[in-house]
């Protein structure tokens, strides 16, 4: 019973003394110890085994027990010492706390004494400085009074002097005095309630009014609205009067400027009246020459009279431009039928040159907000009549690289005078647009005539497959028209020009490209099987001649160039035209037209090679395959197909070297056309023996290898065929091989044969199965049981998908092919 109680006590003690791992780790860090008894994972059994490893060591058990007892007594002594030391800790803590509280109370008392002394010191300082503050206020008020009296004296004296000098027209002294009086008067705004101050202010306003009227009268006398200008240079009186006008109401200054400019341009209105011969567009140079002479005359006679900041030379030029625009608009409306395109362009050229002259000489600081709003913000200066660093040769080279008006340097600063006169020509730009319509029509006709005269590009030359030169000529002309028209207007005329561009892009596509594509002939339709099998290497089987193949490739390359450049043309037109009109620029229809030409060209190349291979496939289907006794080399029809591929494909590849993506498209289309046709003719080879099937399998493998190598066939540089093309060939020709493997398999037992068919052909349907049975030469009675077994072994297809798998793996329908072509063309457009 006692032993059980001791065990329970030990267990409870161990439970109480069980420490968490974190606490145990902290203890080990603070009190490191190597004693096994201090370890957290202490094991009494292991510890005893360590002390007594053998039975012989038990002889020393008394010594070990004595050592442990001695250690226990030592630990007990240490514990008692520590416990006794903790008995007085609470009392010592309370005593320390009381001492700290007393120290804090003493500190608060000292702080309160310091605060009281500071308040007493502040009160003493206020009493000492009270009298000094009153003296400061008195001094400040006295200073203000003296300053105000001085200002009042200055104002009164200044007003008297101002009135006297005004009567004597002493404008030089008035300019400085008036500014001083105005500055002094500002100090009295808060004293306007005082009658005397208000009276002085009214006298200043009256003097200003009198000065303004007097100065205007002096200018009217010097420069009368009617009559000739006063001879001689400007007087010092008027020069000083302008300085005074700078200080007066701005309306006085504007009135002086208006009257002077009106008088200065009065001669111009007389010389270039609507009924005068020099007023018409053919003599527009004389207008600009006249104003240039007037500007020189002004600088010599009146340059020093007006302050420089008035910019009188620029103001005269701007007013001249407004008057000229109005006069030209009026005369062109009256004589609209007499405007010819050469005359219009001549006038616009001279006008834009004059606007450029103004931009070089003046900053445009006098152009009012209304003027700036009225004149649309100009595009970058690309005036074709001004000096242009880009030569025509450079332009043509850039166009050959597919670049249209690519920016090569930072954008030039806008010309603030752009359109200030030339805007008047915009309503008459229909003459220019009609002229460009006529010129482009003649250009297209010339292209057609040149093509007929020079003929298609010659094979075996650098011309073969190259872009037609007429294409670059067309876009060079387009660029010149676009740049020129953007100088004339960036509004509706640009939209009209875009419509003209669209019209002749379509005509070029129809007349030059589509119109010159060779027509499919039927000359090879009379080839017989015997003649096909007897043909020698190098004989002509292709429907198109070498020249015609080169022509098709050249038209394809040209259409691709037109497609890319038309897209760039659309972007540049959107940059040139007003932002509000950009949505009306859309050349997608024209790009689709060129895409159609590309598709037609590729289709012709595919049809040509396809037609060349047709007789060989017909010969394959007519051969007596049931009589073949041994497997030899590839059959003659395979040799014929390979011969035609080796004849046509290298020519097409070399001529489409600059458009590899379309050569790849040609290869893909040919594979999609040839492989289904080959499988169709394969089903016609019936009946067929086992050896015949083996020969056909060998032929099929040979064709598969040739088709896989088709993109680089006959080329010195071997390139890996595109993955998309390889996938089509492998999928299609593997199906043909699987068909032949099924044909070669014995048809008994029936279950094994049917299962083998389902395993080899993924499109396992009854129609294909029956064709294979026909190839094996089985009778209809045998076929019916096998077909029934096939229907039983086939898994039920999902609703609505029956037959669809067959269609998807047989030749694609025209709709599917057309859809695929459209998707590919859209992808090409995006990448371009």
UniProtKB/Swiss-Prot annotation:
Any coiled-coil regions, as ranges: 55-142
Residues bearing PTM Phosphoserine: 377, 580
Record membrane topology: Peripheral membrane protein
Principal subcellular localisation of the protein: Golgi
Keyword Protein transport set for record: yes
N6-acetyllysine: modified positions: 110, 360
Keyword presence, Phosphoprotein: yes
Gene Ontology biological-process annotations: endocytic recycling; lysosomal transport; protein targeting to lysosome; retrograde transport, endosome to Golgi; vesicle-mediated cholesterol transport
Residues bearing PTM Phosphothreonine: 391
Compartment annotation: Golgi apparatus, trans-Golgi network membrane; Endosome membrane; Recycling endosome
InterPro entries named among the record's database cross-references: Vps53, Vps53_C, Vps53_C_sf, Vps53_N
GO cellular component terms, A-Z: cytosol; EARP complex; endosome membrane; GARP complex; membrane; perinuclear region of cytoplasm; recycling endosome; trans-Golgi network
Keywords: Acetylation, Coiled coil, Endosome, Golgi apparatus, Membrane, Phosphoprotein, Protein transport, Transport
Annotated region (Disordered), positions in chain: 373-392, 794-816
Protein family according to the UniProt entry: Belongs to the VPS53 family.
Subunit description: Component of the Golgi-associated retrograde protein (GARP) complex, also called VFT (VPS fifty-three) complex, composed of VPS51, VPS52, VPS53 and VPS54. Component of the endosome-associated retrograde protein (EARP) complex, composed of VPS51, VPS52, VPS53 and VPS50/Syndetin. EIPR1 interacts with both EARP and GARP complexes and mediates the recruitment of the GARP complex to the trans-Golgi network. Interacts with VPS50 in an EIPR1-independent manner.
Main function: Acts as a component of the GARP complex that is involved in retrograde transport from early and late endosomes to the trans-Golgi network (TGN). The GARP complex is required for the maintenance of the cycling of mannose 6-phosphate receptors between the TGN and endosomes, this cycling is necessary for proper lysosomal sorting of acid hydrolases such as CTSD. Acts as a component of the EARP complex that is involved in endocytic recycling. The EARP complex associates with Rab4-positive endosomes and promotes recycling of internalized transferrin receptor (TFRC) to the plasma membrane.
The protein, known as: Vacuolar protein sorting-associated protein 53 homolog
Species name: Mus musculus
